[in-house]
Amino acid sequence: MGNFFNNGQRMPNIFERARAYEDGNKGYVQQQKPKTNIVVNTNRIGYGKKSTVSEFTAIAYDGTGNKIDSIKGYFLEPETNYNKAKVRNSDTSIEQGNYNVISKTELEKRINTERRKRGEEDIQLTYKWYVDSVPGRSGIAIHTGNYGKDTKGCFLPGENYSYDNATGTYNVWNSKKKTKELFDFFDNYGHNGIKINVNSK
């Protein structure tokens, strides 16, 4: 005979209890984020009077370090002058190096925690993704744009680029499309962190 509760209802057997546990935890399992991370490798390949162009490859890795996906494109930055790269508001490309890319939400939380300690009001950032802890600089973001005047140190993604002989400047094109592709890539695979390595050829 089976086991019964005091109210006369039959107690579920071990298989029924296991199934109920599994069903009850489906939402939890589905909400767990995959252990994937991203490395963005950039190489500066063109130096203009008012802008710098680099090629990038963003690579996604699984939890064991295996490459699972990648995308390519170009970044536009302002003019490169390494003597001013660490100078605040210098309107130049940042110094070469390895950085973390963090979300607007994460950076806002950190900034506003410090501001509250000083009795200051919270701020709201503009862009979705930021290059973190750049020496001497702040607010270095990844966002749309086509021309050198559109960036004060930020990275502007593009599908392709061109060089204007008359002005000596580089431009990137189809920026909105490439930015969306890159941000979708970040959202899909950047759960365990995003790094960007800024280099020159």
Model-assigned labels for residue ranges:
Residues 1-39:
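Low-complexity, glycine/serine/proline-rich disordered segments
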